[in-house]
Amino acid sequence: MSRVCQVTGKRPVSGNNRSHAMNATKRRFLPNLHSHRFWVESEKRFVTLRVSAKGMRVIDKKGIETVLADLCVRGEKY
């Protein structure tokens, strides 16, 4: 399973670790992902999504029904 938020599309980005001497070594910044079950009232079932913390805030704001409709338009399965 890839490290991508199903709602926002956040994915790992690359950057540098910086030591005290400012030496640079490559690293990855990973999104804050969680598998979370959401209750969908219209379908009377739980839906499990892999979402970031920002994705959970989007679901709180828009509602799970709207977010799932957007996923269907993009062609993603949930």
From Swiss-Prot:
| Pfam families associated with the record | Ribosomal_L28
Q: Does the keyword Nucleus apply?
A: no
Q: What keywords would UniProt list here?
A: Ribonucleoprotein, Ribosomal protein
Molecular function in Gene Ontology = structural constituent of ribosome
Q: Where is the signal peptide?
A: none
SUPFAM superfamilies named among the record's database cross-references: L28p-like
* InterPro entries registered for this protein in UniProt: Ribosomal_bL28, Ribosomal_bL28/bL31-like_sf, Ribosomal_bL28_bact-type, Ribosomal_bL28_sf
Residues annotated as region Disordered?
Answer: 1-21
GO terms for cellular component: cytosolic large ribosomal subunit
Please tell me whether the keyword Transmembrane helix is annotated for this protein. no
One Gene Ontology term from the biological process aspect of the record:
translation
Which protein family is it in? Belongs to the bacterial ribosomal protein bL28 family.
The protein here is known as Large ribosomal subunit protein bL28
Organism of this sequence: Sodalis glossinidius (strain morsitans)
